[in-house]
């Protein structure tokens, strides 16, 4: 709104119509390319920190009302990304109504075309809720990234730095993009392919087609 590109009323209207009205797709594309959470030190990242702190404080305050119970804040969707997404309308990051929400504290897939692994990681580290719970980092790596001692050391350094900055949980997939595409077309050809879905692993062939697509999209976009 400060840039005079769109006002709150117009944005609200496009969200309520799932960008299906006149000019809706143009607005959706603009939103999907805006400075979003996970892109580094953007205004959206700053708001994410404020929202996380407010949410954590509100959750903890509930414990004071119910002695004997401890309510712990956390930022994770676990295996409910599809189920929860079906209850959520269009969102200002360009996501269509009822599509899956993001995995845990990760930005929605496709938030930046350059991958921006460090920027994404910094953003997630900044919204850790504390109190013993987590805002997990979901990381997709191509096996080729680990070829050679130097490459392995870079990955190890990244992981060490991640936790030094405050990360509390890291889920890693090391899967070849072409292989995951082939497995999605015919899961029976890859009965032993195991993927890290979020806070748990599963045989890829055991996932529903809808959940397989979610994992494939995430791996191809970020991997």
PLM ranges: what are they?
Residues 1-223:
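Acidic, glycine-enriched catalytic cores built around paired aspartates
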């Amino acid at each position: 709104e400060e840039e005079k590109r769109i006002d709150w009323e117009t944005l609200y209207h496009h969200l309520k119509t799932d960008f299906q009205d006149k000019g809706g797709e143009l607005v959706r594309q603009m939103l999907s390319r805006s400075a979003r959470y996970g892109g580094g030190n953007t205004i959206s990242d700053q708001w994410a920190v404020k929202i996380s702190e407010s949410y954590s404080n509100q959750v903890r305050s509930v414990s004071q009302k119910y002695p004997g119970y401890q309510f712990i804040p956390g930022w994770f969707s676990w295996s409910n990304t599809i189920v929860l997404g079906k209850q959520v309308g269009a969102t200002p990051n360009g996501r269509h109504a009822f599509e899956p929400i993001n995995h845990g504290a990760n930005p929605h897939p496709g938030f930046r075309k350059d991958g921006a692994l460090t920027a994404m990681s910094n953003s997630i580290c900044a919204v850790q809720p504390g109190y013993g719970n987590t805002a997990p980092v979901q990381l997709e790596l191509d096996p080729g990234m680990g070829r050679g001692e130097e490459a392995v050391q870079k990955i190890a350094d990244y992981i060490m730095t991640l936790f030094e900055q405050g990360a509390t949980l890291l889920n890693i997939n090391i899967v070849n993009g072409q292989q995951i595409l082939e497995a999605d077309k015919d899961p029976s050809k890859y009965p032993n392919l195991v993927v890290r879905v979020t806070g748990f692993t599963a045989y890829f062939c055991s996932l529903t087609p809808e959940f397989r697509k979610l994992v494939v999209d995430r791996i191809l976009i970020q991997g």
